[in-house]
Structures are given as structure tokens and as C-alpha cells.
């Protein structure tokens, strides 16, 4: 009889943070909104706060970067470690060190689903429908997958059953789709800059932006709009029709997450052939089931916010059962290892984090070492063949561990 590998137990979990309101600004990392000055990601982008003039020019003005990066590390009894990053900062550290640790330490490194279920159920009374708590649980879950892969010597995508394609092809999110085309991406997604409080003039301005970019990029390059929860159904419908002559591929996250009836109506009224997408800020499996029932075309969970890889796999199954695509919100290696195993993810998102979108920069720079970026708009599966998620933690970053246990 062949020997069966004896897996170690988890000895300790630790949590650090960097950036956010209580540390240095512009740290980047897991909180990719935490960028320095003159960055496209903070340049007059439409948000739910844009209706207040004091907060319409900059997303950082209303505090989009106050959380900072959470780093969770899990250590096995044999000394091997796994880690992950997300957006939860110092508050996430408290949740990990003072609550979730009891469900992690002492478990076998393969007990990922058990730990995940216990974390979800133990936080129901204060987690609501996602948010900070789910970001934290996601980070723990990803760290556990990283550790498991390193212990058994396999990349995470092979733990999920293996690749269904040889490479991942990407579209780029940023202010310059024309530059993205030159870099080999299949499409470009731009943020909208105006909302319902701007009236029809706002629609005309954003439609003109799409028209200008269509002229620069040509007919065969995808163009999309990211509306970041900033619109209502009427405005979104009018904007979609205003952009239809320029072959807009999809219109994304027009409405706040819980407006399911609004998404159903928007899908009914959108121009024929234009897709409606959402999911970045949905935070539970149940919310994605309801979102799927609206009939939208693509669900876009963030693996660092929706419950981790364990939940992302379940979301992909929901989407597949309805013939929908699941294209995760850009989350680098954490989604790469998942989507290369999903048959309903024919492409993926790469978030441009260079200030003017003119260069390729790893999304979670500088917190991850050896983080891959697309080459000619693609990443081959061989790039993902290192154990775990294949990246290392940059311990030269200003990491703080505010709590212990």
C-alpha cells in the first residue's frame, strides 16, 4: 500500500497591515486605491458620493483609501507559511487575531472548507452582507489555499482540478484603452466621470469619451464602461443607448449592489447586444445567487472581498448553471489561479495601476514579490506553476502587527 502524505496542522495565524488612515498614504499593495497624487484611479470618477460637490473630484476625498492593506500569514507546524493580501487594514487585523484565530489554529492545512464555514457562521451577527468582515475572511481563505499548495508542492490552480486552457487573455481597466491596445490587451474599460446629478450633459460627456476612444482604437477592440455604483436605472439606460452607436461591449456596476430589481430592469432595457455586468461589491454567496437571477450577463466577484477562493468557486458554479460568465474583478494571482480552471471565464481583468496607464505595473505592487503581469495581453499557465499562488511577501514594506494572541 502506498504511503499517504501526512499533512501538518496550522500552528499560528498572524495579521499585519500597511497604508490606510492610520499609516502612510499612497502605499498601494492590497488596497490598490491607496495611490499617490496624480493617479488616474482618483481622477474625477463618478461614485455614489459624486452628488455631493465636496466629494466629486476625488475618491480619496470621501475616504476610499482609509482601510489599507491587510496581510494574513498562516504557519504550519513544519514551519511552512502561506499568506495573502486584501483590503481590510488594521481593523481586519483585529478580526483575525482576536476572533478568527480560534477557527484556524490546530486545524489541518487541508481543512479549508471547514475553517471557511466556521468563519462565515461565527461572524454572521456582525458581518451583514459583506464588507470589511468578508474582506478579512477572504484574506484568511486565500492564505490557507496558499499554505496548502506550498505544503503539497502544487500551484493552487492544480488543487482546483487543473487548467481548462493554456493561457488567460486580459482586458485592461484604466483611463487609456488606446494604450492598452498597443500592449496587446483585447479591450479597455474606462471609468465614467459623470452621474445622474449631472443630467443629460453628463451622458453626453461620457458618450463623447467613448466615441473618441472608439475612433482611436478602431472597431475590433472592446470598449466598456465602469460606472462604480454611481447611477440610477433611468440614467444608466440612457447612457447605454447613447454609447450603443460606438459598439460598447458592456456597461458595468451602474447601480448599488442591493438594487436587484434595478439590474433586472436595466438588462431588459439595455441595447440589444450590449451586456450588463456587476458583482464587484457583492459580498456573499447568497447575494450572487440573487444577482444571477436578474439575468445580467457577467458576474464580477472580487476574490479578496467575496469570501475568498472557496466562495469564488461556488459563484462560478451558480453562473455556469445559468449560462452566465464569471469574470472576477481584477485581483491578480488570486483570481488567475481560479479563472484558468473555469470554463465560463474566457477572459479576465487586469487593473492598470501605473499613474497614467502607460506602463505595466503589478496590481498589488509593492506588497507582492514575483507578481506576474500579462505579456502581450496574456499570461500562460506555466507562469502559475509555482506552489501555492507563486508569490512572496515583501517584508521590506512597512508592515505593522497591532494585535497578537
Curated annotation (Swiss-Prot):
State one molecular function term (GO): magnesium ion binding
What PANTHER family is this protein classified in? Answer: ENOLASE SUPERFAMILY, MANDELATE RACEMASE, MITOCHONDRIAL ENOLASE SUPERFAMILY MEMBER 1
- Functional note: Catalyzes the dehydration of L-rhamnonate to 2-keto-3-deoxy-L-rhamnonate (KDR).
The feature of type site (Transition state stabilizer) is located at 349
User: How the protein assembles, per its UniProt entry?
Assistant: Homooctamer; tetramer of dimers.
Write down the required cofactor(s): Mg(2+)
Q: Which residues bind Mg(2+)?
A: 226, 252, 280
Enzyme nomenclature, EC number = 4.2.1.90
Q: Give the miscellaneous note.
A: Reaction proceeds via a syn dehydration.
Note the InterPro entries from the entry: Enolase-like_C_sf, Enolase-like_N, Enolase_C-like, L-Rhamnon_dehydrat, Mandel_Rmase/mucon_lact_enz_CS, Mandelate_racemase_C, Mandelate_racemase_N_dom, RHMD-like
Pfam families noted in UniProt? MR_MLE_C, MR_MLE_N
Q: Name the species this protein comes from.
A: Shigella boydii serotype 4 (strain Sb227)
Q: Which gene encodes it?
A: rhmD
- Please give the catalytic activity noted in the UniProt record: L-rhamnonate = 2-dehydro-3-deoxy-L-rhamnonate + H2O
- The molecule here is called L-rhamnonate dehydratase
Q: Where is this site: Increases basicity of active site His?
A: 302
